[in-house]
Regions:
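His/Met- and acidic-residue-enriched segments that coordinate or traffic transition-metal cofactors
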Residues: 2-164
Length: 164
């Protein structure tokens, strides 16, 4: 009996449905950490940014990612995912690095970081949006906002690059 229970658990763990659940859980955890990070980076942009565009983008990031995080937390709860309550260590380190900058340097590095970050986020969210669960539904609902953030970051990045 013990052998058959073990075999059943091994088969379950190897099943595509179990793998999809694990991928969705991982996605949600990363999304929640990312949302916390974006809220904090948005606040930082409002404090340390020089241009009105960077400050306005920071406000948008804080507002949009705070709202998105509530939806991500709801999706995590519905899937039984233990949600993180803060950005991850790498995100905190990036925030701390950026917190030491001000003015044009902050604006330039912030815009570059946001382009790279949102480009990766868009790829991750588009992949997850193909899933037919709460994580996929959450991802689908965020793609337009992420695209808007990506486009705005690119615009700010090109302005900062050309104004050197």
């Amino acid at each position: 009996m013990k052998l058959s229970t073990t075999a059943a658990l091994v088969m379950l763990a190897a099943s595509p449905a179990f793998a999809a659940d694990t991928a969705s859980q991982t996605f949600l955890k990363k999304a929640i950490e990312g949302n916390y990070a974006e809220v904090e980076m948005g606040k930082l942009a409002q404090q340390n940014g020089k241009s009105d565009g960077v400050k306005q983008f920071g406000q948008m990031l804080s507002d949009d990612h705070a709202a998105a995080n509530q939806k991500a937390l709801d999706a995590a709860k519905s899937l039984g995912v233990s949600a993180p309550d803060a950005p991850n260590a790498k995100q905190k380190a990036e925030h701390d690095k950026m917190a030491k900058m001000t003015g044009d340097r902050f604006d330039r590095d912030f815009a570059r970081y946001m382009v790279a970050d949102h480009e990766k986020d868009l790829a991750d969210y588009k992949k997850e949006a193909k899933q037919s669960d709460a994580a996929g539904d959450y991802a689908k609902g965020q793609i337009d906002a992420l695209q808007k953030h990506f486009d705005m970051a690119k615009s700010l990045s090109s302005v900062k690059s050309s104004s050197r």
